[in-house]
Amino acid sequence: MNVINCEEVKRDEFHTEKYYESYNIFGAHIVTEDEMRGVRFTVWAPHAKAMSVVGDFNEWDYEQHKMLQVTEEGIWSLFIPHIEEKEIYKYAIETMAGDVIFKADPYAVYAEVRPNTASVVFDIKGYEWNDKNWSRKKKKKSVYKEAMTVYELHFGSWKKKEDGTLYSYREMAEELIPYVVEHQFTHIEIMPLVEHPYDRSWGYQGTGYYAATSRFGTPHDLMHFVDECHKYGIGVILDWVPGHFCKDAHGLYLFDGTPTYEYKDKDVQENPVWGTVNFDLGKREVRNFLISNALFWMRYFHIDGFRVDAVANMLYWNKEGQEQSNEHAVSFLRELNEAVFAEDEDFLMTAEDSTAWPLVTAPTYEGGLGFNYKWNMGWMNDVLKYMECAPEYRKYIHEKMTFSLLYAYSENFILPLSHDEVVHGKKSLLNKMPGDYWDKFAQLRLLYGYFFTHPGKKLLFMGGEFGQFDEWKDLEDLDWNLHDFEMHRYMHDYFKELIALYKRSKPLWQLDHSPEGFQWIDANNNEQSIFSFIRQGDKQEDALVVVCNFTKATYENYKVGVPDFEYYNEVLNSDAEQYGGSGQVNKKRLKAIQEPFHNQAAHVEITIPPFGVSILRPVKTRKGSKKQDGSKTKVRSNVTSRGKR
């Protein structure tokens, strides 16, 4: 890290200009000055009356190591010789009211393990990365036209040791990575790893934005974890929270005794949703703090993406009874995304946004917010409501399963089956399913089949892959003992086969963001709650036919319109006995009958299983059949696309 001496910094740069290397100025840096080794401490506290550095080295006496104010706008700095790495410290701040408060360093790269709250001097330099091959391979791929399967996890509750203690970053590399590789996930998405005092905030209420939480080890240990992920071809996405922060006394809240990182106006300062305070995104120093932080994680931890939390809460003010857009946040998000993509054009910037704000994933030069992905919260809510409904009543809410295709190409979407839907009394995905024991597993297999064949990249929260029965319990690990039960083993086998099929089937991801990649065969069979559609790849011969039955009825010789290929094979049936189903499968090759049906040139007659999904793949290339106007048959959607980034 290239530490910049404060006296050499242009006086107003941090305060008035875009300065995205603020971590080079602020924090605690091990340096040599005047031939003496020590630590240079620098902090921004614009309304402090006086500042000092305290720690074990001076018995926490705030009179000993007074800091020098080096800019009128409140940058303070001090070099203390003979202090070494691992020294704990805080800033003692004399406020304008005459009080002395003690704060952790906003730019510290390491902190004490909770419940202790001091910052720790740490030399973040020195880790030797081994992921050049990963970087080269990533450059050759498009984030839009590749398969993407994201495994969302909470680091502290995926798995614990027998004595209930946490695995370290290095130990998790040994435990987690082989599991992720076995399941063929392309990425892991980790809930926030910034330092945070309260375990049950899951990291979303942070105090140390530059400090990887010490619960699991040192920053270098986390670098090793990311390095190992890259070694095995796994991308790493971090949850990141630039909208709000916690009110713990040692953190950013009222940092110098006055609103510093948060809004001054009480009406917009408080975030009543989480009991936190909102970052003042109109303040240049706060923007530089946050955007520098994003680039810090990219540069020093080689992170491949951010899932930006609570974008909806940022875009609109929290004022009661009002829905007024926050132009500070809009401008900040655009600036953030421009800075991130200038650093790495292949980075993943995903917005967790439940609003109808337009052009979230459009480039800023087109008037968009500049993200390249957005969680499809509407799809998630509609589909889960549909699945929770008793099967005999699903025909009355049929549109919940078709509505998403009316806007599927308005943004670049990720379909999330996330942690938010399996906690706080919402039940696990398996337990959301109505009916008896067998019905629940059959419908979860069906849901996953629909999930993997619907346009959009995929995200699943941990435990869903084997049918976790209880909802997520953040203080415990997953119920790994469920593998002792046959139906959970069947579910696990099915999920692995489904994800493998997804990854090797270009029609399921190649045109995720183009209307050319999807066509309804029959979207209107509400009486039987059966949906059928085509997924299409770049090549016309790359096509899959998907049929989903959301009731327990079995149908023999059911006619489904298909593109004009000669034969079809069933490549996956969720009702197969090896997955715990009843065995209503289509074993034989299906000959396409050359009679139009469902606006297709031909049709097949198949067995449709109860609560089942059947995926058909053409055996031979298309015969070049002609439509009545003489043109070749072409799979095409009736929805329009805004276009890709």
Curated annotation (Swiss-Prot):
Gene Ontology molecular function: 1,4-alpha-glucan branching enzyme activity; cation binding; hydrolase activity, hydrolyzing O-glycosyl compounds
UniProt catalytic activity: Transfers a segment of a (1->4)-alpha-D-glucan chain to a primary hydroxy group in a similar glucan chain
Keywords: Carbohydrate metabolism, Glycogen biosynthesis, Glycogen metabolism, Glycosyltransferase, Transferase
Its biological purpose: Catalyzes the formation of the alpha-1,6-glucosidic linkages in glycogen by scission of a 1,4-alpha-linked oligosaccharide from growing alpha-1,4-glucan chains and the subsequent attachment of the oligosaccharide to the alpha-1,6 position.
E.C. number(s) listed in UniProt: 2.4.1.18
Keyword Ribosomal protein attributed: no
GO biological process: glycogen biosynthetic process
Active site: 309 (nucleophile), 352 (proton donor)
This protein's pathway: Glycan biosynthesis; glycogen biosynthesis
UniProt protein name: 1,4-alpha-glucan branching enzyme GlgB
Assembly, per entry: Monomer.
Region entry Disordered, spans: 619-645
NCBIfam families attached to this UniProt entry: branching_enzym, PRK05402.1, PRK12313.1
SUPFAM superfamilies according to UniProt: (Trans)glycosidases, Glycosyl hydrolase domain
Any one annotated GO CC term: cytosol
Gene: glgB
Cited InterPro entries: A-amylase/branching_C, Branching_enzy, GlgB, GlgB_N_E_set_prok, Glyco_hydro_13_cat_dom, Glyco_hydro_13_N, Glyco_hydro_b, Glycoside_hydrolase_SF
Family to which the UniProt record says this protein belongs: Belongs to the glycosyl hydrolase 13 family. GlgB subfamily.
